[in-house]
């Protein structure tokens, strides 16, 4: 967060493209690393739906897309150098492609039955909000002129990417935490389970 605030401050208050670029790259790289580490923390061999390297890569992809849209939106609204904004758009396209590959790979890891059981979440949350809208918005940003509407498209892409990332995480918990009701059952029937 601190690097993001410094980046935004450098765009608005400091007229130094190098400082802005360095702060932006540091913030982006630390965000990507933290997203991967968070996703990797869920690799648990007793939960087959979580025990795959595709999960932290999908986490990383969705976080990178949301972060990419945020950087593009801030740069556009702050009136950053158009060359930097264009470079961010191309980086964003790479993030969107990465996210699409690993989100779909993780959905395939879950299998068709689990996806069908959670069809609305997968269809509207992950596919539409997390993949289709970000892809369309990123392509539009890469080819459209930088104007007031540019920032609106970046903001719309950001909101959709956040919704898609949240949907992926919700699905992770829905398919991976099915055993949690056993704790409630044990609490309700404590004497029968513990023979007391």
Where are the model-predicted features located?
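Long, contiguous internal "core" modules enriched in hydrophobic/ aromatic residues
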Residues: 3-145, 150-151, 157, 161-167
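Extramembrane terminal tails and long inter-domain/linker segments of multi-pass membrane proteins
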Residues: 172-196
């Amino acid at each position: 967060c601190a690097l993001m605030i410094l980046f935004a401050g450098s765009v608005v208050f400091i007229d130094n493209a190098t400082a802005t670029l360095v702060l932006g790259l540091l913030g982006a790289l630390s965000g990507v690393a933290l997203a991967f580490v968070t996703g990797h923390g869920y690799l648990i061999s007793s939960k087959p739906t979580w025990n795959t390297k595709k999960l932290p890569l999908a986490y990383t992809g969705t976080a990178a897309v949301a972060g990419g849209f945020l950087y593009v939106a801030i740069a556009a609204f702050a009136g950053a150098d158009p060359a930097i904004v264009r470079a961010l758009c191309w980086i964003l396209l790479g993030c969107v492609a990465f996210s699409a590959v690993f989100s779909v790979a993780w959905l395939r890891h879950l299998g068709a039955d689990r996806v069908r059981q959670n069809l609305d979440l997968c269809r509207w949350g992950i596919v539409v909000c997390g993949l289709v809208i970000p892809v369309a918005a990123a392509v539009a940003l890469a080819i459209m002129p930088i104007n007031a509407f540019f920032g609106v498209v970046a903001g719309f892409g950001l909101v959709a990417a956040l919704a898609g990332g949240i949907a992926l995480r919700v699905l992770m918990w829905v398919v991976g935490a099915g055993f949690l009701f056993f704790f409630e059952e044990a609490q309700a029937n404590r004497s029968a389970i513990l023979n007391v």
